[in-house]
């Protein structure tokens, strides 16, 4: 380890000002409000890079968050489904329940929940690319009667829900 650190010492010194930069970002986030427009801009700059780009390195569910591996999970898709199920076990949706997913991404959780449980699911995103993909995905799965994908900011929600999920 010491040899690796010694070889990288020049690189380490390049980042010596990083702490100052991190503190400045912290202060910036305190004083710059996360408005609806700012949120939409930030999401668009990242998630609207193109679905093809994300499909190159995400699993087949296009889930963009950490998976949960256990002894049975052999690959990333299994581990993502394992995560979905653990979240469902936490929210315990009942038959006919109304469930909200905030930040639905490309619709992986919506598809999983919609196929396995008799619920009404509202899914929201502010990414145009994710919305288009998720809407088409749910339609292809025949779940459009149970799952409603919308472009909407969570601050604009008016409905009441039995459960709310948001995967980070």
Please tell me what each predicted stretch does.
Residues 2-57:
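N-terminal auxiliary segments of SAM/dcSAM-dependent transferases
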Residues 60, 64-65, 71, 75-96:
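Conserved alpha-helix/loop element of class I SAM-dependent methyltransferases that forms part
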Residues 95-103:
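Conserved class I S-adenosyl-L-methionine
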Residues 106-118:
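Conserved SAM-binding loop of SAM-dependent methyltransferases across substrates and taxa
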Residues 120-125:
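Conserved SAM-binding motif I beta-strand of class I
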Residues 134-135:
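Conserved SAM-binding loop
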Residues 141-154:
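Conserved SAM-binding strand-loop segment of SAM-dependent methyltransferases
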Residues 155-164:
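A short acidic, Gly/Pro-enriched loop at the edge of an enzyme's catalytic core
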């Amino acid at each position: 380890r010491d040899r690796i650190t010694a070889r990288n010492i020049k690189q380490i010194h390049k980042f010596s000002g990083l702490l100052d930069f991190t503190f400045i970002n912290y202060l910036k986030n305190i004083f710059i409000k996360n408005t609806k427009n700012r949120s939409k801009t930030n999401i668009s700059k990242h998630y609207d890079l193109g679905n093809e780009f994300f499909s190159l390195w995400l699993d087949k569910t296009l889930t963009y968050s950490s998976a949960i591996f256990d002894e049975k999970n052999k690959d990333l898709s299994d581990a993502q489904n394992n995560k979905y199920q653990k979240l469902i076990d936490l929210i315990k949706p009942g038959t006919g329940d109304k469930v909200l997913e905030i930040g639905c991404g490309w619709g992986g959780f919506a598809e999983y929940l919609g196929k396995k449980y008799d619920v009404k699911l509202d899914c929201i995103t502010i990414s145009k690319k994710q919305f288009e993909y998720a809407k088409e995905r749910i339609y292809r799965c025949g779940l459009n009667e149970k799952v409603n994908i919308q472009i909407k900011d969570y601050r604009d929600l008016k409905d009441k829900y039995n459960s709310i999920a948001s995967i980070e």
